[in-house]
Amino acid sequence: MIEIVKSSTFDTWLRGLRDRQAKARIEVRIRRLWVENPGQRRTLKGGICEMKIDYGPGYRVYYTYRNLSLVLLLCGGNKSTQDQDIKLAQHIVKQWED
């Protein structure tokens, strides 16, 4: 099985969600990632993946793989903040590489 690590940025974002249904749906998708079945996603440049959650404003979770047994959850957002969230995810990946 895969180990999932949350960045502090991701953890703060998820804890800040007020919509309990949205939070529950996101957590279900994270558990699916844990068993290597992420569902609807796309791969972005730099090894970052975008998980799409079709609920509410279109939530997104950005993550990357580190070796074959670790997933790092980078940050989250929704369709309206997508461009900024991708840039933030790229920045977090760079920090983890340093």
Which residue ranges define each predicted feature?
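A short, surface-exposed loop/turn module that caps and links secondary-structure elements
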Residues: V28-Y55
